[in-house]
Amino acid sequence: MNIKEKQFESDIEQYLIKYGGYTKDDQSNYDRDKAIDMTKLIEYIQKTQSKEWKRYQRVYGSDAQNKIYKRFNESVEMHGLLYILRNGFDDRGIRIKVASFKPETTLNQEVIDKYNANILTCTRQFKYSTENENSIDIVLSLNGIPIVALELKNQLTGQDVNNAKKQFMYDRNPRELCFNFNKRFLVYFCVDLYEIYMTTELRGKDTFFLPFNQGSNGAGNVGGAGNPENKDGYTTSYLWEKVLQKDVLMDILQRYMTVAIDEKINKKTGKKKISKKLIFPRYHQLDVVTKLIEDVKTNGSGKNYLIQHSAGSGKSNSIAWLAYGLANLHKNNEKIFKSVVVVTDRTVLDSQLQDTIYGFDHTDGVVEKIDGKKTSKDLRDAINNGKKIIITTLQKFPYIYDEIDDNTNKNFAIIVDEAHSSQSGNNAKKLKPALADTTDSLKEFAEIEGKEESEIKDSEDILVQELLTQGYHKNLSFFAFTATPKEKTLEMF
C-alpha cells in the first residue's frame, strides 16, 4: 500500500466525515484555556433544551454562556466527565444536559431528535496547549468537548505504535486541563498500519497502554497477537470503520465506559487509599457483547450461547455489559426479556457487577442482589416482580423452581459465570425449571432421556420434570461464560 505523509490521517478523517457521522472542524472557536468549544456546546443546548436555555438566560442574562461553562466545569471536577455526559448538571434548579443518547425504542420522536442533534466533530492537528503549538493528529469531540485522541504512526516512515506511546507519555503534559483524568479526553489511541494500543489516563512515564487489537485471526477466533490482514484497506481500519462510528462510540459512552474504584487500607497507617480507573472496553469485549446482543435482537429469546472468555481478559466487565444490554434490549419497541439473571459462585463478581451496572443506571431497583443475607423467597419475588437484573448464586436457585409464578410468555436471560462449574450437578438441573415455559410437549425430550438418565441419579418423577427443562425453550436464553469449556459443557451448548 502506497501511503504518503499525512495520507493515513486524511483517509481516517475522510471516512469519519463521509460515513461516521462527524463534521470537519477547524478549531476556530476552541478555547485552549477552558479545553472546550463553548459555541458548539451552546448550539447543542439551544437545539435540544430551548426552554431550559431561555430560563438560564433569564437568570444570568448576557453572562449565561460563562455561567454554563463555570457550572459545567465545577460539575466535571466533582463527578468526572463521564458522569456529566450521562446525567448533565443542575444550576439554580435548571437541569442542563451536555449530550443525548440513543433511545431503546422509536416511540418518542423528541428523544430521537435530541440524539440526532449531538454535534460530533473531527479535527486534524488539534492544538491543545496553552504553552506551545503542539498538536494531536486527530481529535474527536462531542458537542465541543474533546473526548477521543488519536496519535498516528506509519511504518513506511520508520515509526510505529511505540513512537505514539512515547509521544503520549513524554510530550503530552497530564497537567494540561484537556489531559486531566476524566475531565476531557476519555480515551487515547496509538495507531499504526498494523496495531492499536489505548489508555484512558496519561500518567507520564507511568502511562499504561492496553492492546486494542482483534487477534491475528480476527475477533472471536483462536489466534495470536496482532490483527488479520485487511485486503480492502488498512489493517487497523476497524477502529474508525466500527468503533468510532457515531452510534458505536455513543453506545460505548452510555453503556460500556465505567469508573472502577479500588479501595486499599494502608496496614501501617490504617488510612484508606482510593484510586479510580476509567474502563474502556477492549476490542474483544466490545465484539462479543455486540454480537450477542445483535443475535438476540434478530432471533429473539430461546437460544443458548457459550462464550470462551479467558481469565484475566475482563470477563467480569463483559458479563456486566451484557447484562445491562440484555436488560434494556427491545425488538419492534417491545422489551425482549422480563429479567436478566446472573448466576455466579463468586462474591467478588457480585460486587463488581453491581458497581459497574450502577455506574450506568442510577435508577433504584434496577439491580437486585440475592446474597447470603437473603432467602430464596427474595429471589422468587425479584423474578416475579420483574427486577431488570438479578444477581444470585446457584445454591439459591433449586428451592424456588416449583413455587415460581407461571412464566408463560415471559422471557428470561440467564448469564452463567464459569459455565462448567455452575452448569453441572443437581442445582443446575433445577435452574431451567424455575424459569422455563413448561407448556411445551414432553415428547420432544423423549429422545434425550437415555443420555440424561446416566447423568441423573434422582427419582424417575424428578427426572421427567428435569428432562422437560432440557433443550429448546422459546422463553429462556442461556449465556455461559467460561475460560475452559469441558466436554459436557460443549455438548450442552
What are these regions (language model features)?
Residues 189-190, 390-393, 476-482:
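Structural recognition of the conserved hydrophobic beta-strand(s) that form the central parallel beta-sheet
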Residues 2-339, 348, 352-363, 395, ...:
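ATP-dependent helicase/translocase motor core
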